[in-house]
Amino acid sequence: MEINVYSASNKLESYVISAVEFAMAKFFDVKDLDKYISVDVDFTDLDVEGHCIDAGDGEFSIEIKKDLPLREKMIVLMHELVHMKQHIAGELEFGGIIIGKDGLKCKTTTWMGAEFDEEGTDYFDRPWEIEAFGRQLGLFIRWVESIDEGHHKKWQV
């Protein structure tokens, strides 16, 4: 698996690489991913905390709001890695994106093989968001424990 990190300090870059490897190992047999997965993680100006884009052919782009505190950046990364897992596993698929007055919107969304109507569903009630929010903190805590900074003050774990 290829991991590229942009707009990050050396320390943050090492955390991101470690966290991506950790989360993907929880989801998949990593040696299978090594063959075809590439992810770019960029810390940038965003109106939202983060998002994950499936660019196709095993290429993913994760952008995270650069102004977040370190702990929040890493939790958002875990959230977006759950979405990356959903795309890789074929659980979540966005069928084209349109740009509207309210920003980016998907033409169609497929969740677990069935078309899903996002229009009438609150963001927090979408099943892929329920999974991502439900797993982000647990992944974060287990990752922190794995890097031997378990209850370090900066992580507030």
Where are these regions (language model features)?
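Auxiliary, metal-adjacent structural segments of Zn-dependent hydrolase domains
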Residues: 1-56, 69-70
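Hydrophobic (often cysteine-bearing) scaffold residues that line and stabilize catalytic clefts
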Residues: 12, 16, 74, 124, ...
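A short glycine/small-residue-enriched secondary-structure motif
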Residues: 55-60, 104
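Catalytic Zn2+-binding segment of zinc metalloproteases
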Residues: 81-98
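Short pre-active-site segment immediately N-terminal to the catalytic Zn-binding motif
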Residues: 60-77
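Short alpha-helical functional segments enriched in proximate histidine and acidic residues
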Residues: 76, 84, 88, 135, ...
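Short coil/turn segments at secondary-structure junctions
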Residues: 4-7, 64-68, 116-123
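Metalloprotease/metallohydrolase-associated module, dominated by Zn2+-dependent proteases
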Residues: 31-34, 94-157
